[in-house]
């Protein structure tokens, strides 16, 4: 009978998976030193279950039989059946062990995987935002504006990295400047409040764009966040430019808040496709100015480096780092790991 298990080591080969709402991504690690065997992204809508997707696209095509699986998922991990956010798949670790031949299955939060990546990304996998280019062995934070706003902490103590998942994307965000006070009344509230995720995600770009249009009494032109971003980068639509300037400002504010919470002297990392697409905007003075504007701690904030994670598979990289050297990380297993 599969059961929760507390031993750190997971036997190789190990399948690592990053399961999102639209795509699932997988690598197989044959041992602790070999380069990962990579596979094409799987569209979750193409398969009724994750088990069938793994069987058809990974096991049958590769000819490998992993002994372990480490899966990062967007959704609460509460019991033996783990429903995913924005995807009809359900993770059933016991069934995976019985039907797919695994001996060991560990399921973690998606931003735990991103936090693990923040501990292991090399210089070529991160783009500095601002004048500071080096990290240090200190606590870190990773934020990812995407479908929502993910936030993860990474504490460093006793020579070990401890990922700290949470719901930091749902902290309050409010107006500070005169322009903010004009715009914020037009942003949709959830039960009377505006959280970071209402603005700092894909749909949040559109919320912000529409609020600016409403504040200025003009008709919106664009209905796709990608269009707003594209025209801001080109600089050919002033409303789009203001939208993304404010997006970067608010992202800097929240990133600075999270840096203070975790005392993230080791760096703050921005992950995901949106962050990668808007690197030119993030490199403007706006982001760092908002990030550092945390009186009475402005001088300290100037010493904290900020980066965009540009590794194409950052979450898988983080999971792989953990699989190879589990003793370097303090990853909770209780209630999240099952063994044959």
Curated annotation (Swiss-Prot):
It catalyses: D-glucose + ATP = D-glucose 6-phosphate + ADP + H(+). Its EC number is 2.7.1.2. It comes from Allorhizobium ampelinum (strain ATCC BAA-846 / DSM 112012 / S4) (Agrobacterium vitis (strain S4)). The gene is glk. PANTHER family: GLUCOKINASE (PTHR47690:SF1). Pfam families: Glucokinase (PF02685). GO terms for molecular function: ATP binding; D-glucose binding; glucokinase activity. Keywords: ATP-binding, Cytoplasm, Glycolysis, Kinase, Nucleotide-binding, Transferase. HAMAP family: Glucokinase. It is found in: Cytoplasm. Its main location: cytoplasm. This is Glucokinase. Coiled coil: none annotated. The keyword Transferase applies. Belongs to the bacterial glucokinase family.
């Amino acid at each position: 009978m599969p059961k929760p298990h507390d031993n750190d080591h997971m036997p190789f080969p190990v399948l690592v998976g990053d399961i999102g709402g639209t795509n699932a991504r997988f690598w197989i690690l044959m041992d602790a030193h070999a380069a990962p065997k990579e596979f094409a992204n799987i569209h979750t809508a193409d398969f009724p279950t994750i088990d069938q997707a793994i069987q058809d696209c990974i096991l049958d095509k590769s000819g490998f039989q992993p002994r372990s699986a480490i899966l990062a998922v967007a959704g609460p991990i509460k019991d033996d059946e783990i429903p995913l956010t924005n995807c009809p798949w359900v993770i059933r670790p016991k069934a995976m062990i019985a039907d797919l031949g695994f001996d060991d299955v560990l399921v973690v939060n998606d931003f735990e995987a991103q936090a693990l990546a923040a501990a292991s990304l090399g210089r070529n996998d991160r783009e500095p935002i601002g004048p500071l280019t080096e990290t240090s062995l200190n606590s870190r934070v990773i934020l990812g504006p995407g479908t929502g706003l993910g936030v993860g902490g990474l504490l460093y103590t006793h020579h070990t990295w401890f990922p700290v998942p949470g719901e930091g994307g749902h902290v309050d965000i409010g107006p500070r400047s005169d322009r903010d006070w004009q715009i914020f009344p037009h942003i949709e509230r959830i039960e009377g409040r505006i959280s970071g995720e209402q603005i700092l995600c894909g749909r949040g770009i559109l919320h912000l764009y529409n609020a600016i249009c409403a504040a200025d009494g003009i008709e919106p032109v664009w209905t796709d966040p990608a269009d707003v971003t594209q025209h801001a980068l080109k600089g050919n639509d002033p409303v789009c430019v203001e939208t993304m300037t404010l997006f970067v400002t608010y992202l800097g504010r929240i990133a600075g808040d999270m840096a203070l919470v975790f005392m993230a002297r080791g760096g703050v990392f921005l992950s995901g496709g949106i962050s990668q697409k808007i690197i030119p905007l993030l490199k403007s003075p706006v982001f760092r100015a908002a990030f550092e504007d945390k009186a009475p701690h402005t001088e300290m904030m100037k010493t904290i480096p900020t980066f965009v994670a540009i590794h194409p598979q950052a979450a898988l990289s983080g999971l792989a780092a953990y699989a190879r050297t589990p003793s370097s990380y303090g990853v909770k297993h209780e209630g999240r790991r099952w063994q044959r």
